[in-house]
Amino acid sequence: MKDLDFSKKPLIGVVHLKPLPGSPRYGGDFEEVIEWAIRDAKTYEEAGFDGIIVENFGDSPFSKTLPREVIPAFTVVAKAVKKEVSLPLGINALRNDCIVAYSIAHAVGGSFIRVNVLTGVAFTDQGIIEGCARELWNVKRIIGGDILTLADVHVKHAVHFTNFEDAVKDTVERGLADGIIVTGRRTGESISLEDLILAKRVSSIPVLVGSGVNPRNFRTLFKYADGFIVGTWVKENGKINNPVSLERAKILVRMKNSLMGV
């Protein structure tokens, strides 16, 4: 299994899936869903990205956990993507199904998962979502594997009533995350630099930027972040529902390589 190397500040590209069978907006052509995902994944690989994460972005309105009828399709697409690229692959099962995410990653040879609410409580458009750290560790013990858990702190599209510093510490010390993710308020929105700096100061594990990465802020974020999850700016014309733009993806790779001295 190929893993992420946080010493090299990995660029992780988001493969936003089209609506899956069983989701409200599924269009009826499953092969198109698979082909779209593979194309975006290959574009990230060609551009020089360090990893990809597959998420069921098209399945909104989301449920807190994945409906059973969606899970097989998600697994099939993830396996098809894994077969076509050699990059480390992650899974994010929206809105917060850490058990399914881990199970799919384990089944398809994934390297990591993203969990939106690992600890604490988030008030979201799906209602109140509670952390799932203990349930996740139970599954890890049952099926094994060395899949990393990257956990959001004060995840986007949600309201939080905890102190950010305490939330970081809880995610690291009590949730046992392998890395934490700092995001803006909504998909594609830039993060608070103050939050990133604070997270780096109090966290003993890698800190990733999870939204709003673009050429204008990349150099500044690079000073502090241990990795980047990118999904909006790299799309054609910066529109999230468009395919990944090879040229835009290459721009970030060139910037990263320059800053790394490669």
Swiss-Prot record:
Recorded coiled-coil stretches: none
Pfam families, sorted: BtpA
Domain of life: Archaea
Matching InterPro entries: Aldolase_TIM (IPR013785), BtpA (IPR005137), RibuloseP-bd_barrel (IPR011060)
Annotated PANTHER family: SGC REGION PROTEIN SGCQ-RELATED, ZGC:162297
Protein family: Belongs to the BtpA family.
Protein name: Uncharacterized protein PF0860
Lineage: Archaea, Methanobacteriati, Methanobacteriota, Thermococci, Thermococcales
